[in-house]
Design a protein with these regions (language model features):
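Acidic, small/polar-enriched beta strand-loop surface segments
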Residues: 1-35, 40-41, 47, 59-60, ...
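Assembly/oligomerization scaffold segments
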Residues: 1-35, 41, 339-460, 515-518, ...
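Extracellular, repeat-based ectodomains that mediate carbohydrate processing or recognition
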Residues: 32-341
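Well-ordered beta-strand positions in beta-sheet-rich domains
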Residues: 89, 129, 142, 190-192, ...
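Short amphipathic beta-strand and strand-loop transition segments with alternating hydrophobic
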Residues: 106-107, 156, 205-206, 256, ...
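Charged- and aromatic-enriched interaction segments used to assemble
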Residues: 335, 413-419, 431-556
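Glycine- and charge-enriched low-complexity intrinsically disordered segments
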Residues: 681-687
Length: 687
């Protein structure tokens, strides 16, 4: 998918002379969570939200005593730098000694109206609500929302901030979910879900998006999702975020927040050591762009918690000097990290003027690699590098910081730098290099698809999902949330069973899925995972003739011309029955006078049509691999992996007179100011 260039830049690329231009910025977007405040409050069920004035309002159900005589308390913070605000709690009116401590609690902001929820534990089992119209300064209530039927106890409360409340409550056989809505000055009757009961209840979180509710809830060990359409009060089961086949690992108190287009799901993950011998209890933060596919996330092992943590992005507190920060809130301890701001010199650095040389390498099935040499004369960058294992004092040049590279040429008159972003890379290596004649900084970085080489912590089993769903799922598990899938019919094909194994890399799983129908993928400059189905009808996006510096036209004959694909055997009386599909290259057989057979087995294919489709894709790949070209041309920022090219060499006597339609299989862009190099070397296969 060729990058778009301005008309001026296209004109320069088609010219005979060019003046290279580039831009390189280093940006630290990493959330360096660290202890921020230590109020020391006893751990308990809790929740938090931002009020309209930018203040942070928290609630907790205190613990201790009988269990049905707890308090619901509230806290309002306007200046997060003030420790006293984190330790001050006020009991809400009518909530002293009357709250069920294990019913959990919730708080939400419904268009400026704050509501806090908890279950009455003494004198009734009402779900109570308190209201604040002044950003949490004062509160009224409680009012009864609903009394769960049969005197049931609540096992988790959540609110999406849409004048709503959702909760898990006891029913025969386990727990059910219900909801109520506020309208016209009163709460609606209970709407109970139509799904089967779950074995236990350990928290629920709610979000309202695109006129639908998504609920994430826990039975104590697994994290489930379901949907609710308020238009027809329709419930629907959703995907399982984290499944459990035993009671070894617990997951409780899910909480949701949203910032910068991503949802963050926080839950407490714990192990009592009964089965594994390992004992821990800490928050895990998962992320998602669509509430369907979630990353494995990040653990905060050094932030122990039992009853819940809340992740909040707080860009503008109404008072104090904290600035834009992200927080993970527990009652005993507050963790925080600075949000990225380009105006912060500790997070942003323009290193364009110091680039001595760079090489970027892109190839199929591997993360793109960038190696940069920066001029470090007089130690200009010495103090801007974060030391390895630093616990604070972060600088822009640090491990996992982003290197954003743009390439182009000077255009117009007078000459003006015109560049196009070609990649975003995560810093993996930092080296200071000193010699009598040199002083430079060597940076090596890889694009975000390197996350695909991480290993899965837990096994996940998927049954009856489409290929497109599974590709998006594996990508999200690795932290790749933006994905573009082809619109061909293969993406909608059902994969009967797929297992993401614990200890397996996500790339292994993604490659296995893509191999079903011959798909390829790469990460573009905006960190979008581009998944493509290659076809011989793909257009040529660029033509080369006079610009060619060196070229090699080649071909190889070591390839198959008859492909047989066997899938899952059909169910029937015959034990010898097979599910197969075949593809033939008759022209190649006639050319070489040989049948070269490739036999491929894929049990994920269940029909002869699917087997025939895969056979045709494998045969097409064999035909593409027969073409082996390489070319060196002036650096072209428009080109990406798998783009189609037209190559036409000069006629005799200066050239070979060869021409070809081909596809980029790998590319190496090299810039070296000291040696006057600005070129691109490409390895090509057939289109």
């Amino acid at each position: 998918m060729v990058r778009s260039l301005s008309p001026a830049l296209t004109t320069v690329l088609n010219g005979l002379t060019r003046v290279p231009s580039l831009a390189l910025t280093i940006e630290d977007h990493v959330l360096h969570y660290a202890p921020y405040q230590s109020p020391g409050s006893a751990d308990a069920w809790n929740d938090a939200c931002l009020a309209e004035d930018g203040s942070l309002v928290r609630v907790q159900v205190t613990r201790g005593g009988f269990g049905f005589t707890s308090n619901l308390q509230v806290q309002r913070i306007t200046d997060p730098t003030q420790a006293v605000q984190w330790s001050a709690w006020t009991t809400l009116p009518g909530a002293a000694g009357l709250i069920f401590e294990d019913g959990s609690c919730a708080i939400s902001n419904s268009a400026g109206m704050l509501r806090a929820f908890a279950q009455r534990g003494t004198g009734g089992n009402d779900l109570w609500a308190w209201t604040s119209l002044d950003n949490g300064v004062s509160w009224t209530g409680p009012v009864s929302v609903v009394s769960p039927p049969g005197g049931a106890l609540i096992k988790g409360i959540g609110s999406a901030g849409n004048h709503d409340v959702f909760f898990l409550y006891d029913v025969l056989g386990g727990e059910a979910m219900g909801c109520c809505f506020y309208s016209g000055g009163s709460w609606s009757a209970l709407t109970a879900w139509s799904l089967p009961p779950i074995a236990g209840g350990a928290g629920v979180a709610a979000v309202f998006a695109s006129a639908l509710y998504t609920l994430i809830y826990s039975d104590g060990y697994s994290l489930f999702t379901c949907g609710f359409n308020p238009a027809g009060s329709v419930w629907s089961a959703g995907p399982v975020i984290a499944s459990s086949t035993s009671s070894a690992i617990g997951r409780v108190s899910p909480r949701l927040s949203q910032a910068n287009g991503l949802y963050t799901l926080t839950c407490i993950e714990y192990d009592t050591g009964t089965l594994t011998g390992s004992v821990y209890s800490y928050p895990r933060l998962r992320q998602s762009a669509d509430l369907q596919h979630w990353s494995e996330g990040l653990i905060l092992h050094d932030l122990p918690s039992t009853y819940g943590a809340v992740a909040v992005s707080w860009p503008a507190p109404p008072a104090g000097s904290a600035g834009a920060r992200a927080y993970v809130l527990t009652l005993p301890t507050i963790y925080s990290a600075s949000l990225f701001q380009a105006s912060n010199p500790a997070q942003y650095l323009d290193a364009s003027a110091s680039v001595l040389s760079y090489t970027r390498l892109e190839q199929s099935g591997k993360p793109a690699r960038l190696e940069v040499l920066l001029d470090n004369t007089q130690g200009r960058y010495n103090a801007l590098v974060t030391p390895v294992n630093a616990a604070g004092g972060y600088q822009p040049i640090g491990l996992n910081a982003s290197l954003v590279l743009s390439e182009g040429y000077c255009t117009g008159s007078p000459l003006t730098p015109t560049v196009v972003k070609v990649g975003t890379y995560r810093l993996a290596q930092i080296q200071f290099v000193r010699a009598p004649e040199a002083n430079y900084l060597r940076l090596v970085a890889f694009d975000l698809s390197r996350n695909l080489d991480l290993v899965a912590r837990y096994q996940q089993i998927y049954a009856g999902q489409t290929l497109g769903y599974l590709i998006a799922e594996i990508a999200a598990r690795a932290g790749l949330f933006t994905i573009v899938l082809p619109t061909t019919s293969q993406i909608a094909q059902i994969v009967p069973m797929f297992v993401l194994q614990a200890g397996q890399t996500y790339r292994h799983a993604l490659d296995e899925l893509c191999s079903i129908y011959g798909l390829v993928y790469f990460l573009d400059q905006d960190e979008t995972l581009q998944v493509r189905e290659l076809a011989s009808s793909d257009p040529s996006v660029w033509s080369y003739q006079p610009e060619i510096e060196t070229i090699s036209f080649g071909s190889t004959d070591q390839r198959a011309n008859h492909v047989i694909v066997s899938g899952k055997p059909p169910i029937g009386p015959s034990s010898a029955a097979l599910t197969t599909g075949e593809a033939f290259d008759d022209a190649h057989m006639r050319l070489i006078g040989l049948e070269r057979l490739l036999h491929h087995v894929d049990p994920k294919l269940s029909t002869t049509v699917q087997c025939a489709q895969k056979a045709s894709f494998l045969l097409a790949q064999q035909a593409r691999a027969q073409v082996v070209h390489s070319v060196t041309v002036p650096l072209n920022p428009a080109l990406q992996l798998f783009d189609g090219l037209t190559l036409s060499d000069s006629a005799a006597p200066t050239g070979s007179g060869q021409s070809s339609l081909c596809r980029i299989l790998s590319l190496r862009a090299h810039y070296d100011a000291r040696h006057g190099l600005n070129e691109m070397q490409m390895e090509l296969e057939g289109l």
